[in-house]
Design a protein with these regions (language model features):
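Generic detector of bulky aromatic hydrophobic side chains
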Residues: 24-48, 69, 93, 98, ...
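C-terminal solvent-exposed extensions
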Residues: 108-204
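Flexible, polar/acidic helix-loop-strand segments at domain edges
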Residues: 7-97
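Extracytoplasmic/periplasmic, Sec-exported soluble proteins
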Residues: 1-2, 51-55, 71-79, 93-97, ...
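Generic alpha-helical propensity signal that fires on short helical segments
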Residues: 16, 34-36, 78-81, 101, ...
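Extracytoplasmic/secreted envelope proteins and their assembly/folding machinery
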Residues: 3-7, 11-13, 56-60, 79-80, ...
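Active-site-proximal beta-strand/loop segments in catalytic clefts of secreted hydrolases
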Residues: 1-3, 21-23, 66, 136-141
Length: 204
């Protein structure tokens, strides 16, 4: 199981430090219960808010929380937080220990990558700081559009494209094309959401 593999990897590096909010505890413990039942484990509940040293099972449970403000966006941020903290721990290990973590992961997860490809990628990944893991669109909101279902809406597309060019290319004076402007207007007309309607999901 990929889930169990990640939990085992977190345990191998000594757990991760995560700030758990009071509102998250109920859902976190529900997922811990599911984890224990599925994998025949006895992972303890998290009983208080604040900075916590989570073991593998607790960290996986934390990363599954979605039924709070922010929904899937907030869940993605929790997953990124766990991965970031895990890599901080991996950097503290010596080379042989690092290789063992990734080798064990390879043996227990489903992937199309070869083992050598994974190990080479791991060598590169541990050199990077994963603190800024925001995604496009930067300013957005969620809305149900009937037959189209739940959608992520850029607020607005033109504004997001300007931000993208500034962030990726360092272009502070980028002017969107007429095509981008046209699509941006169409999205506003169809959804009713403008750049002033972006929801703060706490990501970057």
């Amino acid at each position: 199981s990929n889930v169990k593999a990640v939990a085992d990897a977190v345990d191998t590096v000594g757990g991760v430090k995560i700030y758990v909010q009071d509102a998250e505890i109920k859902y976190l413990n529900n997922y811990i219960k599911e984890y224990n039942e599925k994998f025949n484990q006895n992972i303890p509940d998290v009983t208080e808010a604040g900075m916590q040293q989570l073991n593998g099972g607790q960290a996986v449970a934390y990363s599954r929380i979605r039924y709070l403000e922010g929904g899937d966006f907030a869940r993605t941020r929790r997953q990124q937080n766990v991965v970031s903290q895990m890599f901080q721990q991996i950097r503290k290990l010596d080379k042989d220990e690092q290789n063992k973590v990734f080798s064990d992961l390879y043996e227990t997860v489903d992937t199309d990558m070869s083992k050598s490809e994974l190990m080479n990628m791991a060598d590169v990944m541990i050199k990077y700081n994963l603190s800024d893991m925001g995604g496009f669109p930067y300013k957005k909101s969620g809305k149900n559009l009937g037959s189209k279902g739940d959608c992520v809406i850029p607020c607005d597309l033109e504004e997001n494209v300007i931000m993208l060019h500034k962030k990726v290319y360092g272009d502070k004076n980028y002017q969107p094309s007429e095509t981008v402007k046209d699509y941006s207007s169409k999205i506003v007309n169809e959804t009713g959401l403008t750049k002033d309607d972006a929801t703060d999901y706490g990501d970057k």
